[in-house]
Amino acid sequence: MKKLKELTSLLFLFCCLCFCLILFPQTARAGSLTPTAQDNLKVRLRRTSDLIPVSGGYMRVFHQKNSVGVEYYDNDLKIRSKRKINMELPLWGGFYAGSDGYYLVEGQTNNKENDSAEVIRVIRYDTNWNRNGAAAITSNPELFGGEIRTPFDYGCVEMTESNGKLYVVTGHEGYVDSSVGQGHQGFLMAEIDQATMKGKIVSCDLWHSFAQYIKSHGSYLYVLEQSEGSRCTKLSRYDSNTLDCTTIELLPYGGSHTSVWALACYASVDGMAVSSDSVLCVGTSIDQSKYDKVSENTPHNLYLSVTPMSDFSEKATTTRKLTNFTGEGKSFAGVKITKINDNRFMISWEEYVSDDNKKNSSANDPLSSSTLHYLFVDGKGKSLSKEFTTAAPISDCQPVVKDSRVVYYASNSNTLNFYSINSDNGKADKKTYHIAGDNATWNFKNGILTISGYGPLSIS
């Protein structure tokens, strides 16, 4: 009750100060700079937030309504500069830091079902964010599933490079099927020649692809996919020279198709990474042998599958559970796998907890009510550590590695936390920004709320 009263008082004071600061703006202090608030606590198929190691620190990239925010931080995660890149098309796809610059993927709907209409644009920038090329992707009616009505539909937007080509995997909705009154959803992979910036669709289907990830290693591309239509989580290997494809089943789903409509999978596909000799994939699932008896008490568990590159087969693939819940309808708010080096990976997750059962957050850190779980495995998926926990949420941001630290950020509308985990011993630290507006910060200590900065407040 005391905590509730403190937070209620805090909100009341925020509202009062918002009115005061609008009427009586203060003068900005020299050198003051405030990060941009962006709620990224929900883990999405299409990431809206990225963090990239750069010389001297980190670059934060995040999607806003019609633009992309870019902020630079030093190695101590102190903000140094910020800018905005206007989007060229209305649909956000994703961001990728390539070997030859930065890429933004954007799109637009094709409701007129015009085969020659641009539906996806892959825009390249140099490392100073000067635009220096773009590839236009159109439908390819010669391929099954190559007709695009809505790009990115119920899909990720993930990218990798191989042999001078950029590959993008995502989902899409095809042209309307008159027999059902809507288009079917499926997998889509596009290839962009980085020298000419010419792009095309190279693989696609209409088999209800609900998550897609891609990595490259040697002469192969590895694609992890949640294929509801195939009733399994599947892993495909493409020869990057010929695009010949071999696919194996990692996790079969229960149920069977009796119509064109999607069936529940009771599973998620959350990420993949490659070591020097194996492909590691993470996801969650119920016990699929109990599919027909699923209830609100049926738990999900976190699993890790490992497929050796030298024997790319279902028989050689091993799968093990990383959690062992048996009831209470346990589920997950998000799962990530982060490559530290070829023989060390961090798997992190947050278990779903109802608002009624969450622990109280501190008044000075609204994000501290969540619990992040993480552990380390080697390149063959064997455990290297115990399971660690820290007061932090999972977020939309994929963790990155710099100077033996795994770093990511989480943010709501008024707090931005950078979390840093020592990749050797698992110790976690954080740096917090309290954001009260574009040029204002807040702090709550000893029952006193302090607002610093100038201009209007933005409080949610």
Locate the predicted segments by residue.
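Extracellular, repeat-based ectodomains that mediate carbohydrate processing or recognition
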Residues: 31-429
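N-terminal capping/linker segments that flank leucine-rich repeat
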Residues: 28-30, 430-460
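Sec-dependent signal peptide cleavage junction
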Residues: 21-32
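Positively charged n-region of N-terminal signal peptides that target proteins for export
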Residues: 1-6
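Bacterial N-terminal signal peptides
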Residues: 11-22
